[in-house]
Every structure is written in C-alpha cells, then in structure tokens.
C-alpha cells in the first residue's frame, strides 16, 4: 500500500475570543493518497481555511498530528517545516499573492531559487510550466498586466514548479468568471495526471467540488465524507 501524501489524525484547533475559547477543528482525521483530488466544502467560518493552514504546516494544531510523506510536522524545527512546505507542498489562494514587482516568469522561478535550484534550471522549469498553462507569451508581464485568469494560472504554475506531492488550494476559482474557472479546473486535472500531484481544494464552488475524487464537508468542527 502506498504511503499517504498527507495524513492528519485527531487534529484539534481553537482560537480565543475574549475570555472564550472557540474550537474550530474537533478531532479531524484525513488521509490523501498520491494523485488523489479532494474537495472540502462547508459554510463560511466553518474552519476550512484553518484546516488547510494546519495541513500545510502554516499553523500548528492544539492537539493531534499532521504528516507529509511520513514526516510529522511536530517533530520538525521551523527550518525543516519551511523546507517541507517549499519542496513537498504547493499553495494556491483565491487572491493569487503574486509578487507585484516581479514578472510572471520571476514569480514562478521564486520557489525554485528558494530551494537552491540554479537560476538557469529554475528559469527552464518555470518557462516549461508557464507554457503548459498557456502563458508562454506572457513571461515578462507583471501581475498588474495580466487578467484575473492569467494571474491564477501563474499562481498554479508557481505552486507546481517544485513538483510538490500535494497542492493546497483555497477558493482557487472564487475570483474568476465561469470560463476561467472551467479552464483552471481542466488545467488542474491535466497537470495532476502528468505529475501525479494530489490536490486538496477548499471551495464554495460545488461544480468544482463535484469534479474531485471525493468531497468532504466540514461542519461544527467535524470533517466527514459527503453523504455520510
């Protein structure tokens, strides 16, 4: 049996609101296999983004554990956690978070350079991915010179450039029109098939959610497979 790309066990996370502690995640369990696509749906404020941040090592759970390729986040220091995030995970958000002063090519190269890849190789990898997402003619354009759909495609290329085991996506089509949203969906599937990347997608878009292998619902801090 293959090793899970991401696994979490009994994850609990809460926040303080004045004198009260609000428990957002209550014993969440999840396991993602290589190449699997899952969607996480739920009402606004249900903790979907919090769960994504915990799975990506951006936030620490109050209890429970998260593993990425059998590495437990709790056993890693900050530098090693950063390496796992940079080399084994990719992140895409509703608001692309591209660096405005850099071109599309430079934005996609950035994770490679941070990982210590030589500039020439980073450039080659970034150009190849931007070509795959249909932006070979926009390499030297800065984010302000790109459309919303183009910026999101740059963000997806950036998330994939280090060939991560899993890409975590928070409302990736939330800011896009129907045509661009469908284009992003197709692109995700195509690139995943080529690279065997797993995807965890937090979304309100039920059309997007229903294209995934499995849909989970987060409600009252508890994560369940849709229909259970």
Curated annotation (Swiss-Prot):
Domain ABC transporter: 6-228
Gene3D superfamilies: P-loop containing nucleotide triphosphate hydrolases
Keywords in alphabetical order: ATP-binding, Cell inner membrane, Cell membrane, Membrane, Nucleotide-binding, Translocase, Transport
EC nos: 7.6.2.-
Protein localization: Cell inner membrane
Domain of life: Bacteria
Coiled-coil spans in chain: none
Name assigned to this protein: Lipoprotein-releasing system ATP-binding protein LolD
Organism from which the protein derives: Saccharophagus degradans (strain 2-40 / ATCC 43961 / DSM 17024)
Lineage: Bacteria, Pseudomonadati, Pseudomonadota, Gammaproteobacteria, Cellvibrionales
């Amino acid at each position: 049996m293959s090793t899970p790309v991401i696994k979490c066990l009994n994850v609990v996370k809460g926040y303080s609101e004045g004198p009260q502690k609000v428990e957002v995640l209550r014993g969440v369990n999840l396991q993602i296999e290589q190449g699997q696509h899952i969607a996480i749906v739920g009402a606004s404020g249900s903790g979907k983004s919090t769960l994504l941040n915990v799975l990506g090592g951006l936030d620490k759970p109050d209890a429970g554990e998260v593993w990425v390729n059998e590495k437990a986040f709790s056993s890693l220091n900050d530098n090693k956690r950063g390496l796992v995030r940079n080399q084994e995970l990719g992140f895409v958000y509703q608001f692309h978070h591209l660096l405005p002063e850099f071109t599309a090519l430079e934005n996609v190269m950035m994770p490679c350079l941070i990982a210590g890849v030589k500039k020439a190789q980073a450039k080659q990898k970034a150009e190849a991915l931007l070509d795959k997402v249909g932006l070979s003619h926009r390499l030297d354009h800065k984010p302000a010179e790109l459309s919303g759909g183009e910026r999101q495609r740059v963000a997806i290329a950036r998330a994939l450039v280090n060939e991560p085991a899993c890409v975590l996506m928070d409302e990736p089509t939330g800011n896009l029109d129907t045509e661009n949203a469908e284009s992003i969906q197709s692109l995700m599937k195509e690139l995943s098939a080529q690279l065997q990347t797993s995807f965890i997608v937090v979304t309100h878009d039920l059309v997007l959610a229903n294209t995934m292998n499995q849909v989970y619902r987060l409600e009252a801090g508890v994560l369940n497979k849709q229909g259970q």
